[in-house]
Amino acid sequence: KLLPVYQYLRGRADKEGGEGLTCGEEQILHKVDSTVRRGAQGLLLGGFHTPNHRWAIASLLMACSRLFDSGRMEQAAYTYLNEGIDCNEDGEFAEKSAGNYNRINNDAMILLSEATGDPAYEQAAIRNLRLMLTYWEPDGSIFTANSTRFDKDRLIYPKDYYMEYLKMGMKYNIPEFLQMCNTIFDIVDRQQITSPDFLIWFMLHPEYRKLEIQGGYRRSDFEGFYQESGIARGQREGFTYTVMNGKSSFLYVHNKTMKLEMKVAGSFCEHRAFKSEYMERISQGEYHL
């Protein structure tokens, strides 16, 4: 979160005829500048552990290459980006981490577009945000059972997607994204959880503070089959259902107050629970595993 703070303070310091910085703010800028520069230099050494680390590293290197006019940082960023972005046409990233790492990836894609001027990166974020509109449950939580990371089956609410919906909704005039911003705050209020981390972004982009959108996102009944991701999601009369390929728990039903998880178990030599090898759609709401 230091980068937007640095951009905000540096923008005010560089602004001709602007309000300038107070003595205290100048001291903060000096410390943050040193931290960001040293951090960017450290990222040049490379090294990552999981897929989402690539995009976090690449996006920060690219942004810092613009801030510090560094060709080395830009070149290092492209060594990661040349691998290709692991977001499929469904909008799902490789780790399928709807509860955490997908939004980390979205932040990285948006930052890459801002730094390079190439809108192709943030299109991956837009695809994922559209997918996420089908991933929230009747109680306002996110469907996380498909994740391959620590957030699997955890109770997580979508508050950290707020700024992504706001940024992309405003930039591309997507009403459902802006309505989802209101819905996220409704969920925050209803669940009595902390609000999204938005203050520094509102300071950095005053245009966000001027936006007024009435009403939240009201999702009608739907049925979607994301074949490349091996998952189907649907909603009927207040409950959601999920069918997944390659999972021992292949069916989930959620009605706001209760979640049902289904598996077929047996015992034959090394085989235990049933896991499908393929998934096909027979008709609307009907799937064959």
Residue ranges and their predicted role:
Residues P119-L289:
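Extended polysaccharide-engagement surfaces of secreted carbohydrate-active enzymes
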Residues K1-Q123:
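Aromatic-lined, polymer-binding surfaces characteristic
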